[in-house]
Amino acid sequence: MSGGSTGERPFSDIITSIRYWVIHSITIPSLFVAGWLFVSTGLAYDVFGTPRPNEYFTQDRQQVPLVNDRFSAKQELEDLTKGI
């Protein structure tokens, strides 16, 4: 004999109901639009602190900011970010 029922609705009943699709026909496109706006307005750059595409290289620093020695990484990072 298998385990007892948890009392929850079967997933097949949920995804075949009209109520499910009425709710999700609004929420799924809304999440897509919200994500698109989050990225296209540049808010994602501000929230996560990543540089915008035109900010990777400044006029003062044109080299690629690479850390070469892992034992002196802190000092190298301080030198790289000194002009920022």
UniProtKB/Swiss-Prot annotation:
**What cofactor does its activity depend on?**
heme b
The Swiss-Prot or TrEMBL record describes its family as follows: Belongs to the PsbE/PsbF family.
What highest taxon heads this organism's lineage?
A: Eukaryota
Chain sites annotated for binding heme = H24
Q: PROSITE patterns under this entry?
A: CYTOCHROME_B559 (PS00537)
Short name of one Pfam family: Cytochrom_B559a
Named from the GO MF annotations, one term is: electron transfer activity
Q: Which organism is it from?
A: Gracilaria tenuistipitata var. liui
Q: Which UniProt keywords apply?
A: Chloroplast, Electron transport, Heme, Iron, Membrane, Metal-binding, Photosynthesis, Photosystem II, Plastid, Thylakoid, Transmembrane, Transmembrane helix, Transport
Where mainly located? plastid
On subunit structure and binding partners, the annotation says:
Heterodimer of an alpha subunit and a beta subunit. PSII is composed of 1 copy each of membrane proteins PsbA, PsbB, PsbC, PsbD, PsbE, PsbF, PsbH, PsbI, PsbJ, PsbK, PsbL, PsbM, PsbT, PsbX, PsbY, PsbZ, Psb30/Ycf12, at least 3 peripheral proteins of the oxygen-evolving complex and a large number of cofactors. It forms dimeric complexes.
Membrane topology per the entry is: Single-pass membrane protein
Q: Where in the cell is it found?
A: Plastid, Chloroplast thylakoid membrane
Q: How is the cofactor bound?
A: With its partner (PsbF) binds heme. PSII binds additional chlorophylls, carotenoids and specific lipids.
Q: Give the residue spans that cross the bilayer.
A: 22-36
Chain coiled-coil ranges: none
- What's the stated role of this polypeptide? This b-type cytochrome is tightly associated with the reaction center of photosystem II (PSII). PSII is a light-driven water:plastoquinone oxidoreductase that uses light energy to abstract electrons from H(2)O, generating O(2) and a proton gradient subsequently used for ATP formation. It consists of a core antenna complex that captures photons, and an electron transfer chain that converts photonic excitation into a charge separation.
Q: What is this protein called?
A: Cytochrome b559 subunit alpha
Q: Which Gene Ontology cellular component annotation is one that this UniProt entry carries? A: chloroplast thylakoid membrane
Quick one: a GO biological-process term for this protein?
A: photosynthetic electron transport chain
